[in-house]
Amino acid sequence: MQKEEAIKIYKSFASMKDVALLIILVFIATYILISALNNNSEDGIFIYVAMWLTALPAGIAYIAHDILKSVNKLDEIVNEDLDDKKYLEIIYCIIDYGKNHKQKNLQRTFYLIMQERYAMALIINGKRKEAEEYINSGEIKHEPYRMFSRACIDLDRAYAQGDAEKYIKIYKAAPKSYKEVKLHACRALLMQGKYDEAIEGLMKYTPKNKREEILRRFTIGEAHLRKGSKDEAKIYLEYVINNGKTLREKFMAEELYKEL
């Protein structure tokens, strides 16, 4: 994906023509249905209300699907292509454009999601300080996204410092949305020294994409190394080194590999 395509995706959310058309069609269908009734006004009102109660969730689902589809397309850069640097570049491009142009309609919602993605892109590129400055600047207006990003930064710092006690304390206070991610839960087990539990959980977990597979294998390798099983650790770390492309886990795996 190029910057131009990313901007095009952002611009597409300025128009709500498709959503408006959907609502108009439902309205017309409702009107025709009511007119076809045998002049029973009570039934007509009931069906009218029922149709709109159906149409509104359908319209919302349509909008949510459209946004999610675009977000997933952008996330593929890091999740499938394993190119964290390009991911940061593309997300920043959208953030910069959105910040300097008036936001219309669904662009506001899409931009809020991109703000959280930008903070995450900085973190996975090893730019924790910049991510923290971005959050502290108050740019991320949506509180759940801000809290999620803050937890990621604090946990990343505690992990880098090797401070298990601090890591667990932060993890326990992290948003539910963070702790629900299996990879995060297993990382917490590893930091508590529960290596076998972490490995077992990760062995049973089916990754959703290539990046998750890299993260899964890296954590398994690290857990084996920490418990002293160097032969097992070697297998998983070698996979990460050979397939991690530009992901920082590749370079972290290379450092751990030196301990074998």
Locate predicted features.
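N-terminal alpha-helical membrane-insertion module
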Residues: 1-82
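Terminal, low-structured helical/coil segments at or just beyond the last alpha-helical repeat
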Residues: 230-260
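A membrane-cytosol interface segment of integral membrane proteins
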Residues: 132-162
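N-terminal topogenic membrane-targeting module
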Residues: 57-143
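"A position-specific structural signal for the A-helix of alpha-solenoid helical repeats
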Residues: 72-76, 110-117, 149-156, 180-188, ...
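Solenoid-like repeat scaffolds
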Residues: 59-65, 95-108, 136-145, 169-179, ...
